[in-house]
Design a protein with these regions (language model features):
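Residue-level marker for buried hydrophobic side chains located in beta-strands
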Residues: 25-27, 53-55, 86-87, 163, ...
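Extended active-site neighborhood of metal-dependent phosphoesterases/phosphodiesterases
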Residues: 47, 61-161, 174-197, 204-227
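N-terminal active-site segment of His-dependent metallophosphoesterases
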Residues: 15-72, 150, 171-172
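Intrinsic structural disorder/low-complexity segments
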Residues: 13, 169-170, 205
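Bacterial N-terminal signal peptides
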Residues: 2-12
Length: 227
């Protein structure tokens, strides 16, 4: 399934942080299927890259079951499980409540029923979000949005901020395209908090966007999106 993996060296460019260790991440979504060999090929690339793995959802096709994780994801990208920070995709919810996803990754995936959390990485504040808004609410007043507002407000303003989720706010892909609704609402919160970078998956392609606001207007103060 996977078409590529993105390796990024996170340096606090344009942020007000004091010099701090840089952080290397590998980001990819829509990763493993027993019917294809792409995940094996990209896993070989990741073997040579140190750093945190950001799994952008749809980690195990076709239904995110325990068997899919153990038999398809495990032999390839599962080798990096100890340094992986995942978010759930829509295929994980093909099992009720993404139950098998949460069981496979354990505490690192956040609380079952939520799937969102944050952590520090070098000089960056990193936010993992659950964009499956039909499963966990994403709109104004929802638990996730309330948590996100509080999390970003508590963040040291000298730190750059990176967020990631499965569904892309912006995409030129023909299969799924851009995502509005709750994902746009999450972007609005991120934008107001001056988030710098947002990663996503879902579309099975790779593209980058210049900084923009949640409505897609060019804005040098907006977030740079990559999917």
């Amino acid at each position: 399934m996977i078409v590529g993996a993105v390796a990024v060296l996170l340096i606090a460019w344009g942020c007000d942080s004091e010099p701090a260790p840089s952080a290397e991440v590998v980001a990819a979504g829509d990763i493993a299927s027993c019917r294809t060999e792409g995940d094996e090929a990209t896993a070989e690339l990741v073997e040579g890259i140190d750093g945190t793995v950001l799994a952008l959802g749809d980690e195990a096709y076709p239904q995110g079951t325990t068997a899919n994780f153990e038999e398809c994801y495990g032999p390839s990208w599962g080798r990096f499980k100890g340094r992986t920070k995942p978010v759930p995709g829509n295929h994980e919810y093909y099992t009720e409540g993404a139950r098998d996803y949460f069981e496979y990754f354990g505490e690192v995936a956040g609380d079952p029923g939520e799937g969102y959390y944050s952590y520090e990485l070098g000089s960056w504040h990193v936010v993992a979000l659950n964009s499956n808004c039909e499963e966990v609410r994403c709109g104004p007043g929802s638990p996730q949005t309330k948590w996100l507002n509080e999390d970003l407000a508590a963040n040291d303003e000298t730190r750059c901020t990176l967020a990631y989720m499965h569904h892309p706010r912006f995409s030129s892909g023909e299969k799924h395209g851009s995502t509005g609704g709750g994902v746009e609402k999450l972007w609005e919160v991120l934008y107001e908090a001056d988030t710098d970078v947002v990663f996503s998956g879902h579309e099975h392609n790779y593209e980058r966007f210049s900084p923009q606001d949640p409505q897609g207007r060019a804005d040098p103060e907006g977030a740079s999106a990559s999917s």
